[in-house]
């Protein structure tokens, strides 16, 4: 009776953040083999052998015989109970998101901090409690997942930093298709502080299997038909918007022929497996890239925080080298009075 009264399973109390969950012994068929141990102890010196019984009796006077009380429970029921508790605790992590309509309306969703019960650690704590018959409350281990983009960062995008547009003919349907595809692939991108934008990474391979079509492209100083013709107009439009917004250009090359849609020094050539247009966000706030294509016009807009808005002009110095037209491209930062306070070299063309 003493054993049964003092070695009985109790409720297992699991605490987390002011919430308490209880697992009762009946829910997991938890019990201890006390009856078997009592029977074993009672019969220890009652074997069929008289001499063995005498030996065991005298051995007990010298050494204590330890009999193990074992726990018995239904592992499947325990797992199901812990899974049920985890579902009441777990919260999926969600990044805050920025939404900007084609007309320029800005909104943002809130971030959600993720929570996930450490099931393995919870089971180990319960196993220890049962084994040691120590039913003090267990503090659950819950892993916290912080969102990469928090609410404050998303809501800091509150104004248009810069925009640039170029025109194109709608007569070549293949070229229009390529423009629309690449503009969409590089649009609605939130670029966090220090993060780099890669045009090629976002569009992926510009192949027919990805929807791109044959259209005129500049290859070795000549216009030829090739898959993806027109995507460079999108990258060039974006390049100019990037310059006006003060972002850091990290990779840009010009075409071998002067482009029809931007002046010399203002284009950005891209090619699969080759030239890429890349830039970084130098600000402490995120920026958001938004491209639109409508009625023969590509517009690239870059949004960010009002404190990062700059008064920038683009300066191009044309020159001739080897009988070919070339140019040096600069951006000029101006103060509120329009005076140039800083000139930054971008690249040669």
Task: List the predicted regions and their residue ranges.
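A generic beta-sheet turn/junction motif
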Residues: 7, 16, 293-295
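Short N-terminal secondary-structure initiator segments
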Residues: 1-3, 35-56, 142-167
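Structured segments of extracytoplasmic/periplasmic soluble domains
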Residues: 2-6, 44, 61, 76, ...
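Charged, low-complexity, helix-prone segments enriched in Lys/Glu/Asp/Gln
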Residues: 3-5, 9, 37-42, 156, ...
